């Protein structure tokens, strides 16, 4: 049976639950809920974990409890515990440099300034792992763009208007993940990267 390891990036705790930076958590929680599976804390993996099957595939979902900037600690623990190849993991992460609702599936790449990805790259000593980036848009410019604006934006709560867009994104990504072992990866990459949030 094929096993897929999905790791959503975010910050634990109610304070950050609905923040833009927690899109990785929110998407995987939506996926897990669809299959009536609950997340359980596993200290050895430094994550909350959920598991379910779709056809002949076992999906293992992880929400690191390390906080975003130390996400690599959890990913390292997961990789070591399950003794898996890096091509079996897929990271779900927010991206402030992509327009709201835009999806980018990449097989490898730099952190792009994202501290969660930076931590993973440092722990794994490679950039060669798959990731799905979900756009949250840039912070509004007031008196010129500044660092504080960026922090406030990514840690700010998702608005109702944003949620209506992101719900479409979650559905699209989940639908593609469900087919990850029945369709060629290139097809799924193209499907996600061409997603248009404005289509009905």
Curated annotation (Swiss-Prot):
Q: Where in the cell is it found?
A: Cytoplasm
Residue numbers annotated as active site: 21 (proton acceptor)
Q: Which InterPro entries match?
A: Pept_tRNA_hydro (IPR001328), Pept_tRNA_hydro_CS (IPR018171), Pept_tRNA_hydro_sf (IPR036416)
Pfam families, per the entry: Pept_tRNA_hydro
Any Gene Ontology CC annotation: cytoplasm
Q: Which Gene3D superfamilies match?
A: Peptidyl-tRNA hydrolase
Q: What catalytic reaction does the record list? A: an N-acyl-L-alpha-aminoacyl-tRNA + H2O = an N-acyl-L-amino acid + a tRNA + H(+)
Q: Where does tRNA bind?
A: 16, 67, 69, 115
Q: Which GO terms describe its molecular function?
A: peptidyl-tRNA hydrolase activity; tRNA binding
Q: Where is this site: Discriminates between blocked and unblocked aminoacyl-tRNA?
A: 11
Which example biological process does GO assign this protein?
rescue of stalled ribosome
| Keyword set, alphabetical order | Cytoplasm, Hydrolase, RNA-binding, tRNA-binding
What EC number is given for this enzyme? Answer: 3.1.1.29
According to the record, the segments passing through the membrane are none
Query: Which interval of the chain is the signal sequence?
Result: none
How this chain assembles, per its entry, is: Monomer.
Q: Supply the NCBIfam families for this chain.
A: pth
Which family does the UniProt entry place this protein in?
Belongs to the PTH family.
Q: What does this gene product do? A: Hydrolyzes ribosome-free peptidyl-tRNAs (with 1 or more amino acids incorporated), which drop off the ribosome during protein synthesis, or as a result of ribosome stalling.
The protein here is known as Peptidyl-tRNA hydrolase
Species per Swiss-Prot/TrEMBL record:
Prochlorococcus marinus (strain AS9601)
């Amino acid at each position: 049976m094929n096993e897929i390891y999905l790791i959503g990036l975010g910050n634990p705790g109610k304070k950050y639950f609905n923040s833009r930076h927690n899109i990785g958590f929110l998407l995987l929680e939506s996926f897990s809920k669809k299959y009536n599976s609950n997340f359980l804390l596993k200290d050895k993996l430094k994550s909350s974990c959920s598991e379910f099957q779709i056809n002949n595939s076992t999906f293992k979902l992880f929400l690191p409890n390390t906080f975003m900037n130390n996400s690599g600690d959890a990913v390292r623990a997961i990789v070591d515990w399950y003794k898996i190849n890096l091509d079996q993991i897929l990271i779900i992460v927010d991206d402030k440099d992509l327009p709201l609702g835009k999806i980018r599936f990449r097989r490898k790449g730099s952190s792009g300034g994202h501290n969660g990805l930076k931590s993973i790259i440092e722990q794994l000593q490679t950039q060669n792992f798959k990731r799905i980036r979900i756009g949250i848009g840039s912070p509004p410019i007031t008196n010129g763009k500044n660092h504080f604006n960026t922090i406030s934006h990514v840690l700010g709560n998702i608005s109702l208007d944003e949620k209506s867009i992101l719900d479409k994104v979650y559905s699209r990504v989940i639908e593609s993940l469900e087919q990850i072992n029945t369709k060629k990866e290139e097809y799924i990459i193209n499907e996600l990267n061409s997603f248009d949030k404005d289509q009905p």
